[in-house]
Amino acid sequence: FLIFVLFVFFSGNVFSAPLSEALLQAYNENPVLNAERENIQVSLEEVKISKSQFLPSVTLSGSKSQENTEKQTDSSGANSAFTDVNPKTQSIDIEQKLFQGFAGTASLKKSKIGLTLAQAKLLKTEQEILYQAIEAYTGLIFAEEKLKINQDNVNLLERQVETDQARLERGQITLSDLSQSESSLAGAQAKFLQAQNETVTAKLNYEKIIGPIADTNSLDKESDLNFALPVSLNEAIEISKKDNPNLIISRLEYEQSEKDIIIARSDLSPSAFLSFNSSKSDDVSSTIGERDKEILKATISWPIFNGGKNYASLNKSKNLKNRKKLLLDNALKSNDTNVASAWSNFQVSKSLLNSVTSQVKAAEIANEGITVEYESGLGRSTLDVIQSNSILLNAKISLADSERNYLLSQFKLLQSVGYLNSKYLKLQ
């Protein structure tokens, strides 16, 4: 069973760029992902190369030469008669491998595994790029929200400074109270400038991963993606064991290492091939005008000693297989840990979002009450108002951050089980 999830945060803009469009853009245009797609074509060609080992090789060749003898003498030094010839030869060679120690079969199987491996690596890269795109998309939204919150805070403190100046003239507050307000305003302006820089950085990161964006305000916080999440940690782990590309890659690399042993062992085995040559020669010599010849030859060879190279290659392949087995075992253990971490982060971020939402509501009520009491002269000091504004500001920023983290935690959980791909998200 899976939890069906529909993301809804706030109402979006009428002319907005939804998350699905941004992810589709990254999916189609990201250069790293496109480079990995080319690797699929490379693997397809590798399969064709491996198949060619089972097919005969055919070679056509021809030659023609021209003789021009100016002088010819016999053993006594006297001139002797000669006849120049212009030999021409045409031939065809056909060779078929009959046995090569099962290296050809193992090589073909390895190349087919390599094709599946390339597809798994493409899926892994796709997951990484899509998650980076989600981080960039939500990061830019968060930066814009933080900028707006800080802008509102600057506007609020500017009004408070104006109010405190009037209250100082009426003798309702002291100069130190006004100085506190002015200091708070200066701090808010500094945070606003910092938020502006963070927005620029977030925009550059967005364009690096996803692509150009004309209006950062066009991003929609209301996600149009809907998908299912695992309902339990155990289910998430079981799904990941079957679909996580990291595990698939480790398994396939181990399978390839097994084929490498067979290929290395074939260097110690006999090999056999059959060859056929048919040739036709004209004007061969002064006594032979034409010659047609056919040769059928069977060859068997068995390497006896090659300086120990063959045995060393075999031992190397065995060691590499042991290494891949250890890496596979480690990948299985790491997978459970990574899924458990993603699941825990998802649960914690959901609880934290609920807590921060309540915190913001409480901070808004408290700030409104303290502000009214301050303006009514009911005993609230300037410091009380400043502290209340600061608490509310931090709570709003924490809420925006918690909303983003909750969203990211769900996609991270999808990535950990192997479901963060265009097919599952229905991007295409």
Regions found by a protein language model. Give the residues of each.
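Bacterial Sec-pathway N-terminal export signals of envelope proteins
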Residues: 15-63, 69, 97, 213-255, ...
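Periplasmic alpha-helical coiled-coil/stalk elements that build and connect Gram-negative outer-membrane
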Residues: 21, 128-241, 342-345, 349, ...
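Small/polar (Gly/Ser/Thr/Ala-rich) solvent-exposed segments
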Residues: 34, 57-85, 95-124, 248, ...
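Amphipathic alpha-helical coiled-coil segments
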Residues: 35-50, 125-148, 159, 166, ...
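Transmembrane beta-barrel architecture of outer-membrane proteins
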Residues: 87-89, 135, 180, 271, ...
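Membrane-embedded beta-strand positions in outer-membrane beta-barrel channels/transporters
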Residues: 91-93, 137, 273, 297-299, ...
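Short, charged, amphipathic alpha-helical segments
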Residues: 112, 175-184, 315, 382-390
